[in-house]
Amino acid sequence: MLPHPGACHCSNTINEMKALEKEHVMSVVNTIFKQLVSTTSADVIGSWGVSSIVTTQIVQNINGDNYAMAALVLTVDGLQFSGDAYVAYDEGNDYYRIYAVKSDGKLQEYRKDVAFDEIGSVLDQMIEKGSMTQQEYEEKISALYNLKVITL
């Protein structure tokens, strides 16, 4: 289970592990954010109902060892998921891990080995579209909001 963004994420709660430097975390999360907005259209990000964006670090046990990872946390309210979406950079393998954590702290979905240019599509699938096709999604949006969706 991942901690809520407001909770203490300091690794001093875990013996034998050093927290990442604040500047490093900020730099990594800034890169995550830039990669997300440069590879994902604004209307897609807007559909997630983002209400807050937080910089943090999370601790993940991988093969018995604890690792701190810088993470971008988006609080979202989409069709498929509402809660916190963590995009954490796994420096050991140069890929991202994405976690969807409900407001009760329970992990709903997890993806690993996500490339930078896949972050937006993975988040969109988790938060908004699920397994719907584009046509099914447009029909659901049309019915839900009484709108006609036009794909250009």
Name the predicted role of every residue range.
Residues 92-105:
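Short, surface-exposed beta-strand/strand-loop-strand elements in extracellular ectodomains
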Residues 14, 18-79:
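Negatively charged, low-complexity tracts enriched in Asp/Glu with abundant Ser/Thr
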Residues 1-7:
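Positively charged N-terminal leader segments that act as targeting/secretion signals
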Residues 80-85:
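Short, surface-exposed coil-to-beta transition loops
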Residues 8-10, 14, 18-26, 105-152:
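Mixed-charge, Lys/Arg-enriched low-complexity segments
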Residues 72-74, 86-89, 95:
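Eukaryotic intrinsically disordered, low-complexity regulatory linkers and tails enriched in Ser/Thr/Pro
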